[in-house]
Every structure is written in structure tokens, then in C-alpha cells.
């Protein structure tokens, strides 16, 4: 017997996930994806009764479930008491949530964003979205612009590669010597993040991929 999967909240990534699961033969329902055309939309109580719940990435933002595709708000404290301990719960960026949910509600929330392949795949639309914002904010093309990427994590790597493909002059800053060695090996100008200062004014566009400088 097939288990019911409920995709609850999130953005167009979750809409696409629901469609893929349907195509693979799963019994799928959705809630909170109405503005994105989420398939098989059902009332919240019905969605929360599914054996498997897939929650957004990140699960919560500002104290509530991440719900950019609906006008309905759902506070996290309204959600957790309505779930069962025997449900399989999947969500993204759950490290701060998981211990408290187990302690307070007996729930186990697994973090699909712990998987490296998910983080790398997520870096692609993030990097391309950043480039789109830069294009919209500048009056000239990015070709030949001096671009600085701060940080050489997953997003920084993809971003530098995409910018190179657009013909920009790419510099990348990182804290670790090993990262700066790789930056230079790939043909970008390496800079030390902790030494960025007056030279920031030399760049036409700056992309920051680190949480804090």
C-alpha cells in the first residue's frame, strides 16, 4: 500500500517536487502552494494527516512556516502540536528546530538539506538568481565588469563559474589559504576576505555569499 505524501509550504521547488512525486506514482497532496499551482491541494488538516510530510527549505522563517505561495500564515507553534510522533517529517535547515521538537512534542524532523547533493543543487538557482538581480540593478551588461565574489563555498564556486561564462573579470575572496589556492588555480583573482577594505571600491559588482564579514 502506498503511503500518502504531503508537501506543505515552500516555494516553486516544492511545487516541482510534488509534481515529480506524482509522476513517480506516489499519492501526493499539497497545502500552501496555491499561488504556484501546487497539485492536489487539500485543507491543512488533511495534509497534516499524511504519513510523510515534506516541509519547506528553510522550514521556518520569522517564527512561522515558510509560505511564500499563499496568503495564509501558519505559526510554527500552531503546527507542531497537530503532528504525530509516528509521522516521517522532512524539512530543510532544521538543526535548531530538531532537538526542541523531539523534547517538546516527541517529533523526529529529518533534515534533507544535510545531503551534499541537495546543497550543491540548491546553489545553482541561488547563484543564477543573484546574477539576475545584478543584471536588473545595472544599466550596462556584466561583460567586462569587475566582479567580486565574497566567499568560496558552494554558492561562491557556482557564482564565480557562471560569471566567468558571462565574460566578467572575476575576483574571489576567501579566508582559508587552501581556498585561495583553488581560486587561483581556476584562474580567478584570489583575495583574503579578512583584508578586504579600500579595494572594494574597485569593483563594479560585489556578490556576498557569506553570512557575516
Predicted regions: what they are:
Residues 11, 34, 93-95, 175-176:
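Residues in the short beta-alpha loop(s) of Rossmann-like NAD(P)-binding domains
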Residues 56, 136, 157, 173-178, ...:
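Conserved mixed alpha/beta catalytic, RNA-binding, or beta-rich assembly cores of soluble enzyme
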Residues 58-62, 74-86, 186-213:
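Rossmann-like adenosine-cofactor binding region
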Amino acid at each position: 500500500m502506498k503511503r500518502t505524501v504531503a508537501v506543505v509550504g515552500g516555494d516553486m521547488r516544492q511545487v516541482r517536487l510534488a509534481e515529480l512525486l506524482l509522476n513517480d506514482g506516489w499519492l501526493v497532496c499539497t497545502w500552501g502552494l496555491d499561488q504556484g499551482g501546487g497539485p492536489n491541494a487539500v485543507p491543512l488538516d488533511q495534509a497534516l494527516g499524511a504519513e510523510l510530510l515534506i516541509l519547506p527549505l528553510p522550514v521556518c522563517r520569522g517564527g512561522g512556516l515558510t509560505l511564500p505561495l499563499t496568503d495564509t500564515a501558519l505559526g510554527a507553534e500552531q503546527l507542531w502540536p497537530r503532528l504525530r510522533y509516528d509521522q516521517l517529517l522532512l524539512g530543510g535547515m532544521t538543526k535548531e528546530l530538531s532537538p526542541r521538537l523531539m523534547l517538546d512534542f516527541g517529533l523526529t524532523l529529518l533534515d534533507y538539506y544535510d545531503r551534499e547533493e541537495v546543497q550543491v543543487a540548491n546553489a545553482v538557482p541561488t547563484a543564477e538568481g543573484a546574477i539576475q538581480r545584478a543584471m536588473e540593478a545595472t544599466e550596462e551588461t556584466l561583460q567586462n565588469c569587475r566582479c567580486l565574489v565574497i566567499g568560496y563555498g558552494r554558492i561562491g564556486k557556482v557564482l564565480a563559474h557562471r560569471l566567468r561564462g558571462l565574460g566578467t573579470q572575476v575576483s574571489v575572496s576567501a579566508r582559508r589559504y587552501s581556498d585561495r589556492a583553488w581560486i587561483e588555480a581556476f584562474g580567478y583573482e584570489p583575495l583574503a576576505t579578512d583584508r578586504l577594505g579600500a579595494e572594494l571600491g574597485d569593483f563594479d559588482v560585489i556578490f556576498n555569499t557569506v553570512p557575516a564579514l
